[in-house]
A protein has these predicted regions:
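N-terminal transmembrane alpha-helices
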Residues: 5-42, 56-71, 75, 100-107, ...
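Small-residue-rich hydrophobic transmembrane alpha-helices
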Residues: 48-108, 145-164, 271-335, 366-380, ...
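Transmembrane helical elements of multi-pass membrane transporters/channels
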Residues: 16-35, 137, 148, 171, ...
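Small-residue hotspots at the loop-to-helix junctions and early N-terminal turns
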Residues: 45-56, 135, 194, 266-281, ...
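Short alpha-helical transmembrane segments in multi-pass integral membrane proteins
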Residues: 1-18, 76-141, 185-241, 297-362, ...
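Short runs within selected transmembrane alpha-helices of multi-pass transporters and secretion channels
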Residues: 69, 137-156, 164-172, 193-208, ...
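Hydrophobic transmembrane alpha-helices of multi-pass small-molecule transporters
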Residues: 60-63, 175-180, 204-209, 281-284, ...
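Helix-terminus/linker motif at the lipid-water interface of multi-pass membrane proteins
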Residues: 26, 30-49, 118-125, 181-188, ...
Length: 442
């Protein structure tokens, strides 16, 4: 199923496109969240810290692949909006072939260098072997992660954000039952969670391939998948590497913060890991509204619908701010109940509640930046998103180092560093946004 975003009322289109994105990403986050809940409740805080420490590194690798998919999807959306179906098919096949090879190489490298990477992060020696084992199992499934994200990004570029949701619901249920079986029944600890996650990702990929073979003719596997267009590959890389670097910059900033947190002890590391899980769930809808704006902008740019591009930006920003306000209220009021979902250790809960309530105050700032980045991605100005993300993460780490390591403030310093990063990002983005927005109006 495909959908033309160049026609119809924009606010209902954005809401209708965003809701499946939000639900899909929440189910995807459930993969790792269920791991944390089950490990925290049935194994212990050492295993919970191991899973949490791995998450930023694993996400960094996955984001490199997602960057390729995102860059290609912007081109696909523009080609679909312009009704250039021949170029669209060549774009799809070129991205598929190059991404599969790259993900296989990346998976192998990550497995080999897992221990050196974790040593750089100053992981506590008492949980090093546990963390290495978990990370290596997860990286075995990297190629399945790419294939799913490729197919889902392609479907979204063609206006279909619902179908990927159905695949994720099925695979998330498999992951939950797999976690319960491997951890509680077989007593395999955090490794059992990793095995369950890989199996779930593989099945999600299989479901996606079966669907497109039967229902989406333009994506159906066949000889057309063997087409490799060097000129399109170069353009995809030019979009993809900027998108990948933008996402990688965000994750590298998180890894830098993780390294600082690891100096505070296992309890703080565990609290930080739990809040990061909660923050992922809370922050995802803001990102998804931005992604919906990207899809709408890309198709309407291809169709040269400038008026709809302007209206789409305004509608998207309204949605972002409404959600940011709701998010603050929920996370501040329900901080302790949310922590109790993941862990029983009272020291971990106290650290986590304090941290979560502080960061809840600033969710309105990423609401603004996500909307602005969705706009820039859709019109193809990806270097702006890279620059602003680099400023955000750089300011975060540079601010956190003296606050934590020199002044000894503790976990309370992290929200202050986040605030500084978001403000720096907005200062960088707003002048560029005004200039670009005016150019579209002409």
């Amino acid at each position: 199923m495909t959908k033309d975003l160049t026609k119809g009322k924009i606010m209902p289109l954005l809401v209708g496109f965003t809701i499946p994105l939000v639900l899909g990403n929440l189910f995807q986050l459930t993969y790792n969240a269920v791991d944390s809940i089950i490990v925290g409740q049935f194994v212990g805080k050492e295993a919970l810290a191991a899973v949490g420490i791995c998450n930023p590194v694993m996400t960094l690798m996955i984001l490199f692949l997602n960057g390729l998919c995102m860059g290609a999807s912007i081109l696909m959306g523009t080609q679909f909006g312009a009704k250039d179906y021949n170029k669209l098919q060549r774009q799809i096949s070129t991205t598929m072939l190059s991404g599969t090879v790259f993900s296989a190489i990346l998976s192998l490298c990550c497995i080999i260098f897992s221990r050196p990477i974790l040593k750089l992060l100053q992981v506590d020696p008492s949980i090093m072997d546990l963390t290495v084992s978990y990370m290596r199992i997860i990286f075995l499934g990297l190629i399945f992660t790419f294939l799913y994200n490729f197919f889902s990004s392609t479907l979204r570029a063609l206006g279909d954000s619902q179908t990927p949701l159905y695949f994720l619901i099925a695979s998330s249920l498999l992951n939950i039952f797999g976690d319960l079986f491997f951890v509680i029944v077989l007593k395999m600890g955090s490794n059992g969670c990793a095995i369950s996650t890989v199996i779930s990702e593989m099945m999600c990929c299989v479901f996606c391939i079966i669907y497109i073979q039967k229902r989406v003719e333009i994506l159906r596997l066949g000889r057309k998948w063997l087409v490799f267009d060097n000129s399109l590959l170069k353009k995809t890389i030019s979009y993809g590497w900027v998108s990948a670097m933008q996402q990688a910059t965000v994750q590298l900033g998180k890894i830098g913060i993780q390294a600082i947190v690891n100096t505070m002890g296992v309890s703080v590391a565990a609290a930080f890991a739990v809040v990061n899980r909660i923050d992922d769930f809370a922050y995802t809808p803001e990102q998804n509204i931005g992604h919906a704006m990207t899809a709408l902008m890309a198709q309407n740019k291809g169709a040269n619908e400038k008026k709809r591009m302007k209206e789409g930006f305004k509608c998207g920003m309204v949605l972002e701010f409404i959600y940011g306000i709701i998010l603050f209220a929920v996370c501040f009021i329900l901080a302790r109940p949310l922590m109790l979902l993941f862990v029983k250790d009272e020291e971990v809960i106290l650290h986590g509640v304090k941290y979560l309530r502080l960061i809840s105050f600033m969710y309105i700032l990423p609401a603004a930046t996500n909307g602005i980045q969705g706009y820039f991605r859709g019109i193809g100005d990806l270097k702006i998103t890279l620059l602003s993300s680099f400023i955000n993460m750089g300011v975060r780490v540079i601010t956190a180092i003296p606050l934590v390591l020199v002044m000894g403030i503790g976990i309370e310093a992290l929200p202050l560093s986040y605030l500084a990063g978001w403000i720096g990002m907005l200062i960088a983005e707003l002048p560029l946004l005004i200039r670009n927005y005016r150019s579209i109006a002409k």
